[in-house]
Structure formats: C-alpha cells, structure tokens
Design a protein with these regions (language model features):
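Residues that act as N-cap/strand-start positions at coil-to-secondary-structure junctions
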Residues: 17, 27-29, 75-77, 115, ...
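Outer-membrane beta-barrel proteins
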Residues: 19-25, 35, 67-73, 80-82, ...
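Conserved C-terminal beta-signal and adjacent last beta-strands/turns
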Residues: 31-33, 108-208
Length: 208
C-alpha cells in the first residue's frame, strides 16, 4: 500500500500538472523467491526474483493536467543479485538489477529502467601520517528509461555515477570529505530537471 504524496495531493509543477485530493492509495501484490549461498567465510552471493502487480497506480492523466488513479494495472518482474567479498578490513559488493515494468497494454512504465548495476567498496585504512580513517567508493550505472520531456514521452540517457567519501573519527567527532558525481556526469532526472555535476563537500559532525 502506498498513500499519495503531498505533491500528488496538493502540488503543481511548471507543466500544469496539479494535485488531486480524491486519489486512492496504490495497492500491490508481490511474490518473491530469495536465495543465498556462502562460497566461504568471506564470499557470499544473494539473489531475489520477484513478480508484482500494481493496482490503482498514481500517474498524471493523458492531458497532463492532474494526477489520477489509472485503470490499467502495472506488471513488474525482475531479478536482483549481489556478490559480496569481505576481509582484510575491506568490503566489495557487486550488484545487478534486471527489471521489467510494463502496463497491462504492454507500454513501459515511466522512470523505470530495465537495467542497473554497480559496485560498492569500503576499506578501513590506518595511515602512519593521518591515523585510521574509512574510505568508501560507490559506482552505479542506470540504464535508459522513458520519461515525459515537456512535449512527449522520450527515452532518457543512461548514467554512470561515482561517489567517493572519506571519514575520520577525531576526538569523538567525525570529519568527512565527500566527492559526488566524480565523473561530472551531465544528466536530467526526472527529465527537464538538471542534476548537479561534480561537487566537493567537507563536513564536521560534533557529538555532544
């Protein structure tokens, strides 16, 4: 069960899509099959296959004037897998998501890519100069998807995003350096909404 968001109930955007206080919650039925296999104490593989059906889904109407509960159901199925390596104060995760989300009439659902994959890496480092600190590196590829670009539904480009973060405990406080969108990928998500390029952020979290 997913209740309508405040935006879907009361909001509006630059294209004139308005809210609708008469919306019903979205409903879904899901069947899952989960498997896990430990190759060793340091290597583990997990996988989940699923099939779902979504009723009363909330989307903008054909005139793009307001949000409505659609009469056409959504059928979803997919396979999510991850291979995990751990040891020597470091962890590596490789994952893939294959998904298919289609309306009952065969049309693709908006903003739902059929493929995404990536990798996560974390390591605890003990430097003779800076002492111990944690390093995290994350990569995610998101495949193409359908979205409304202001005039029609069009296929949006795939993206490759890399984030890097370094965190250090300093007298009970946390110092952090974060590099987001390391490859300076230029993209819109959702369509017509440009996302930030490469950014450097320095943080300090004090514990009282």
């Amino acid at each position: 069960l997913r209740n309508p968001s405040l935006y879907e109930l009361y909001g509006s955007d630059n294209y004139g899509i308005g809210g609708n206080t008469k919306l019903n919650p979205e409903k879904s039925e899901t069947n899952e099959l989960y498997g896990e296999y430990n190759f060793s104490e340091t290597i583990k593989f997990t996988s989940t296959a699923y099939r779902a059906k979504v009723f009363d889904r909330i989307e903008s109407n054909a005139a793009y004037s307001k949000h409505e509960n659609e009469l056409i159901d959504i059928n979803q199925e997919g396979l999510e897998s991850e291979l995990l390596f751990s040891g020597n104060n470091q962890n590596v995760g490789l994952y893939t998501n294959f998904s298919k989300s289609r309306k009952a009439n065969g049309q693709a659902q908006s903003r739902r890519p059929d493929l995404s994959y990536g990798a996560n890496y974390s390591k605890k480092i003990n430097s003779s100069i800076y002492g111990p600190f944690n390093l995290n590196l994350n990569y995610k590829h998101t495949g193409q998807f359908i979205d409304y670009d202001g005039s029609k539904n069009s296929r949006q480009k795939s993206t490759d995003l890399v984030d890097l973060s370094i965190k250090k405990n300093w007298f009970g406080n946390t110092l952090s350096i974060n590099l987001t969108n390391l490859l300076n990928e230029r993209y819109e998500k959702p369509a017509t909404y440009s996302q930030d390029g490469r950014q450097l952020k320095v943080g300090f979290n004090k514990v009282y």
